[in-house]
C-alpha cells in the first residue's frame, strides 16, 4: 500500500507555486498562503487530489483500459518514460503530435509503419537493398520512433490521461475533453484546474515533485489488482506546516 505523508510532499517541494503575479485566478481555491512573493499551495487539497486520482486510476485499470502518461517538458520527459515503462503503460515524452487521440486511426497507421521498419531491420531486409535506401528508411524510422515509441503498444484509446504541466499540454487536454477521456493532472498556480477532471495542486517544475506525483500514479496502476488503496498520513497541523515552510529556503524554477 502506498503511504503519502504531508512531510514527504514538503520534502519534494510540492507546495511551491509560481510568483504571485503569475497566478491563474481559478487556482485561488488551492492557495494556502504566500511567502516571498511565491504562492504556497494547500497540501491538504494536494492530498485530496492524490487520493481522488489514485482511485480513478485504479478504476480505469480494473476496467481493462490503460492510462496514457504525458509530459514533454525537460523536467518531466525522463521521469514520464521511466514510470510509464515501470507500470507497462503508454507514454508521450517528446512531442505531442496533433491527433494522437482525436485522429487515433491515422496515428495507428504511422505506428504500423514504424513497426514494419523495425521488422525490416531485424529480418535482414535492409541487407538486400541499397545503402541509399537503407539510409532513407533509417531516417524515417528514427523520426517515427522519436515520437511514437511510447504508444507502439496502445491498441485503443486510453481510459485516462495523466499530464504533467497542463498549460504546456493544452492540445492533449483539448483532444481528451473532446473524446470524454478523463484527465488527471498536476496543476501549478499558473494553470486552469477547471479543465481537469482530477486536479492535483502541486509544483510541476521541480524534478522531485514531478517524480513523486508520477510515481504515485504508477504505483496506483501496479497495485490495482491487489485491492489496496492509498494511505494518507496528515502528520502536520497548520502551525507545523508554516514552520516547515519557513525553514525550507528552497527556490523553484519560476
Curated annotation (Swiss-Prot):
Keyword check for Ribonucleoprotein: yes
Kindly indicate whether the keyword Mitochondrion belongs to this entry: no
Q: Which GO terms describe its biological process?
A: translation
Provide GO CC annotations from the record.
cytosolic small ribosomal subunit
Which superkingdom? Bacteria
- Write down the InterPro entries for this protein, in alphabetical order: Ribosomal_uS2, Ribosomal_uS2_bac/mit/plastid, Ribosomal_uS2_CS, Ribosomal_uS2_flav_dom_sf
Query: GO: which molecular function terms?
Result: structural constituent of ribosome
Q: List the disulfide bonds.
A: none
Q: Which UniProt keywords apply?
A: Ribonucleoprotein, Ribosomal protein
In the record, the note on similarity to other proteins reads: Belongs to the universal ribosomal protein uS2 family.
UniProt name for this protein: Small ribosomal subunit protein uS2
The record lists the organism as Borrelia turicatae (strain 91E135)
What gene, per UniProt, encodes this protein?
A: rpsB
Amino acid at each position: 500500500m502506498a503511504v503519502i505523508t504531508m512531510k514527504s510532499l514538503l520534502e519534494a517541494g510540492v507546495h511551491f507555486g509560481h510568483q504571485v503575479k503569475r497566478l491563474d485566478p481559478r487556482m485561488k481555491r488551492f492557495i494556502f498562503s504566500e511567502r516571498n512573493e511565491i504562492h504556497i499551495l494547500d497540501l491538504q487539497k494536494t492530498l485530496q487530489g492524490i487520493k481522488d486520482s489514485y482511485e480513478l486510476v485504479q478504476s480505469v485499470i480494473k476496467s481493462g483500459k490503460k492510462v496514457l502518461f504525458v509530459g514533454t517538458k525537460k523536467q518531466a520527459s525522463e521521469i514520464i518514460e521511466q514510470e510509464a515503462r515501470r507500470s507497462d503503460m503508454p507514454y508521450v515524452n517528446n512531442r505531442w503530435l496533433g491527433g494522437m487521440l482525436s485522429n487515433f486511426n491515422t496515428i495507428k497507421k504511422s505506428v504500423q509503419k514504424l513497426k514494419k521498419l523495425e521488422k525490416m531491420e531485424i529480418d535482414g531486409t535492409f541487407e538486400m537493398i541499397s545503402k541509399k535506401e537503407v539510409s532513407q528508411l533509417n531516417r524515417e524510422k528514427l523520426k517515427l520512433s522519436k515520437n511514437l515509441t511510447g504508444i507502439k503498444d496502445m491498441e485503443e484509446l486510453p481510459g485516462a490521461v495523466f499530464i504533467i504541466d497542463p498549460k504546456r499540454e493544452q492540445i492533449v487536454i483539448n483532444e481528451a475533453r473532446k473524446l470524454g477521456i478523463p484527465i488527471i493532472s498536476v496543476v501549478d498556480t499558473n494553470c486552469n484546474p477547471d479543465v481537469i477532471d482530477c486536479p492535483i495542486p502541486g509544483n510541476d517544475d521541480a524534478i522531485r515533485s514531478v517524480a513523486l506525483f508520477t510515481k504515485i500514479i504508477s504505483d496506483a496502476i501496479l497495485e490495482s489488482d491487489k485491492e489496496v488503496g492509498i494511505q494518507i498520513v496528515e502528520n502536520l497541523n497548520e502551525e507545523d506546516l508554516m514552520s516547515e515552510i519557513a525553514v525550507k529556503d528552497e527556490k523553484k524554477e519560476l
